[in-house]
């Protein structure tokens, strides 16, 4: 604990010395151009500022959740249209092409360098994303993202959600329903307490991270394709379900499975249930979600691994009129994973078949208008020790085969404009891959991975 406390000033001083000139230059660029009004495609489509849908991107307001529920199709702008006739199809097409761009540049420094690499890494860019995001037709809209990764030096599909949405009445109450095509379990969700859009909303791709993680906690992201349906009744009860298959973008088709640790056999069903209530100054959601998948590692036939994840989550947003309508957000989740790794065990990749993982996280965030936000978060993972599944290795390994990791996250973001985010984030580890000291068997401590991360993000 003492090492974690001491690390912050030392890393921060070095980070500020290197990166401060970049942030000063960015601030001057913004300050000297007060007429700049670059906004994402949803803002251009609706004529509304970013703050209508977001407390702070990607955190959705109740209005933003309704916009997503309705299929991203609300618009106040001109369209090219043609009425439906007996022998002609209808047309509703945005005059403006719904394209947006996100540009991220960042700096990362860990308390101790990673062996064989420099410390204090600047990525310019860290990534660049293109979004086809907006209304396609009267009931069809999209959030479709491709991202350039500087380390891989290529573009690839990122989070994508294409949906059909409509509404009716059921038992005299509002009934929303829709169909979603997406490539990441929970990317279709409306709240920020599930993995795809949960805190931290951004982070370093340079710093080490804990080895163990639940399947639903990002392990299938952009590696699957799914089709599902969702409903919201009376603006309170939300139900959703999606079935997924492995896709492996960039790999040969038909899929041979080679080189992929997860190859879904049949389909992997994902389910979601949530209850929400919204008043003038309060928004509360409590819910559960989960997934079940069977997989043949590195093959499409043979012995199977089985994963069953279930989770509980909540989100509470409180608008405080006495503080000029500043917002305080509370979010949390718990994921339980039960595994039967028969295939991995058969190939000597695990010491025994049955394992479990528990993942917990919680955070509280204060939004100062739409200009500043500060977040404090805690996270932890623990489960079945297995020195074969979690072997010893420098930096990424575990000396005792224990998957337990615990830590905290501090994040401060400043938006000089609603489409520009300047952030500083600190990650501290109390335990990493099972131990506080010499966790990898090569002399590295958990606090050695404590990280300062600086981000400049531009959205236009």
What are these regions (language model features)?
Residues 22, 26-35:
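C-terminal segment of classical bacterial N-terminal signal peptides
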Residues 47-57:
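The canonical Cys-X-X-Cys-His
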Residues 281-414, 426:
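Detector for outer-membrane/organellar transmembrane beta-barrel domains
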Residues 111-117, 154-159, 191-196, 250-260, ...:
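Outer-membrane beta-barrel translocator domains and adjoining extracellular loop/strand segments
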Residues 49, 420, 446-460:
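Outer-membrane beta-barrel "beta-signal"
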